[in-house]
């Protein structure tokens, strides 16, 4: 695995889109739960202001990708080879295409009520063979957690 670089102390993996998809496919095949952050400049700056948030991003995320021109520029300005921006939306579209091709499962989680359902419907239109096994908005109770 390519070692992360540090942008204002935040570890960022300088992967290409394809390297990101390949790395995540390895995790899918290993059935390994993985926490991915697509970090733009705002997220990196928020890590400077909020120690709890920084801990989540810097210590708990398995993969932090440069999502945004600011993150790519900062990495390059610091002398690192950051090949490209890996936007979260584009990454998820690539993963949905891969899932449709290889039969992997997808799940939509988060957002206001109705957003995950709309995303599921859109994904099923864009990727007819995708297997979306469920969706849930970002509002839930402790009692809901087991079902999610």
Give names to the regions the model predicted:
Residues 75-148:
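Conserved beta-alpha
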Residues 1-85, 89:
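N-terminal nucleotide/polyanion-binding subdomain common to many enzyme families
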């Amino acid at each position: 695995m390519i070692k992360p670089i540090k942008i204002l102390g935040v570890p960022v993996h300088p992967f290409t889109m394809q390297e990101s998809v390949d790395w995540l496919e390895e995790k899918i095949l290993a059935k390994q739960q993985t926490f991915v952050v697509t970090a733009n400049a705002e997220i990196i700056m928020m890590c400077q202001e909020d120690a709890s948030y920084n801990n989540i991003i810097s210590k708990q995320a398995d993969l932090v990708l440069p999502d945004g021109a600011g993150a790519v520029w900062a990495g390059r300005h610091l002398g690192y080879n950051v090949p490209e921006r890996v936007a979260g939306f584009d990454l998820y579209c690539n993963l949905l295409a891969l899932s449709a091709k290889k039969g992997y499962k997808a799940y939509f989680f988060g957002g206001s009520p109705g957003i995950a359902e709309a995303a599921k419907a859109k994904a099923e239109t864009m990727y007819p063979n995708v297997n979306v096994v469920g969706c849930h908005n970002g509002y839930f109770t402790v009692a809901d957690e087991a079902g999610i």
